[in-house]
Amino acid sequence: MAAPTAKVSRGWSGLALGVRIAVLRLPGLTQVRWSRYGPEYQDPQIDKEYYRKPLAQLTEEETYERELRKTQVIKAAPATKTSSVFEDPVISKFTNMMMKGGNKILARSLMTQTLEAVKRKQFEKYHAASAEEQATVERNPYTIFHQALKNCEPVIGLVPILKGGHFYQVPVPLAERRRRFLAMKWMITECREKKPRRMLMPEKLSQELLEAFCNRGPVIKRKHDMHKMAEANRALAHYRWW
């Protein structure tokens, strides 16, 4: 009885192998792990200005692309994307980094309260200033947020490189995406770890943003410390290539 059982098992394995080979050869399937869409799917275009542009003002390439998209399959737009005029990708990224436990509603609420606190503080400063000084007071919280992050971005970072059994901290220039990530990470870490027990997150974050906007505060100091370490290790810069 053992021989027929082995023959049946071998038959099933051969059938499964044949089905697998047939599936792999199908052109409509994609061998990308965790991918919902195949390579033939195009990214969605959610910008309203893209559709508001008259056809007479389109170039030949834009006209060809628009006609081509009529016959192509388009991916579903992410739930986090919107065509609102208030959409800011940098603030959305900061909100996602500030989120804990997947509670994005709370993270959005904290971000909204932070921007409101920044605006209230700046308006108090504006009304308390003289007529000459009022022109120099920035009251737009979005402008303050972007400038504060820009001031916190390091230009040069340190990367550990193994040479001769030892790790050396080698200074390397940072990409724009990495600089923005470090600025956001330092800002959030400073507000979480150095925040007084009875101080709310929006109050602490608004203080740090205003200090960074004026090139002051612990986050700016951390950026300068990284630059000093990179300057001290500049003799190891050639380890990037050797």
Curated annotation (Swiss-Prot):
Keyword Magnesium: no
GO biological process: mitochondrial translation; ribosomal small subunit assembly; translation
Transit sequence range: 1-37
One Pfam assignment: Ribosomal_S7
Entry GO MF terms: mRNA binding; rRNA binding; structural constituent of ribosome
Primary localization class, coarse: mitochondrion
Record CDD domains: uS7_Mitochondria_Mammalian (cd14870)
Coiled coil: none
Keywords: Acetylation, Mitochondrion, Ribonucleoprotein, Ribosomal protein, Transit peptide
One Gene Ontology cellular component: ribosome
UniProt keyword annotation of Plastid present: no
Family under the similarity heading: Belongs to the universal ribosomal protein uS7 family.
Quaternary structure (record): Component of the mitochondrial ribosome small subunit (28S) which comprises a 12S rRNA and about 30 distinct proteins.
Protein name as annotated: Small ribosomal subunit protein uS7m
Organism: Bos taurus
UniProt gene name: MRPS7
